[in-house]
Amino acid sequence: MTENRKKKVATVKTISKLIKNSAGLIVFEYQGLSASELESVRNDLKNHLANTMVFKNRFVKLAIDKAGFKELDSYLFGPNIFVFFDEEHKNATIKKIAEIEKKNKFVKIKAGIYEEKVVSDAEVRVIATLPTYEEALTILARSMLAPLQQVSLGLKMLVDEKHIKAE
């Protein structure tokens, strides 16, 4: 095997490991971004603990075919950034990518892998609207406390109007 071929095989293995070890992957197009804008996007995603990489589409196709996500092949054309993220930060990362897409007309979400399924760009945008784990817990806690707060407020109003005596 030639040296060049060995490097290519190693790259495909690296991509395969990234796919296997991450909770998901988002593919987005970045054609038209300047180098500084691209670096800014990568830094934003790095702050959300996402692994942002640029690979040849052919290498990614080989790796995703091996991983069983062949449906993603049709989205791999043009200049793409591949964002790998872990389970803990998946929703926050997807929200950040959607936010970047809204701010920058040159960034276009194409597709991704989320919870072991290939998802389209529209599905990625829907996922971005879902609350993060922490936000969901806050919503749950708030909804559980609301009835108790209403009872407490009602009792306080009765005491204030002297319908009942506070002891």
Curated annotation (Swiss-Prot):
Keywords: Ribonucleoprotein, Ribosomal protein, RNA-binding, rRNA-binding. Gene3D superfamilies: 3.30.70.1730. CDD domains: Ribosomal_L10. GO terms for biological process: translation. One of its GO terms (cellular component) is ribonucleoprotein complex. It comes from the Bacteria. The keyword Transcription does not apply. Pfam families: Ribosomal_L10 (PF00466). GO terms for molecular function: large ribosomal subunit rRNA binding. Belongs to the universal ribosomal protein uL10 family. PANTHER family: 39S RIBOSOMAL PROTEIN L10, MITOCHONDRIAL. Forms part of the ribosomal stalk, playing a central role in the interaction of the ribosome with GTP-bound translation factors. Part of the ribosomal stalk of the 50S ribosomal subunit. The N-terminus interacts with L11 and the large rRNA to form the base of the stalk. The C-terminus forms an elongated spine to which L12 dimers bind in a sequential fashion forming a multimeric L10(L12)X complex. This is Large ribosomal subunit protein uL10. It comes from Mycoplasma mobile (strain ATCC 43663 / 163K / NCTC 11711).
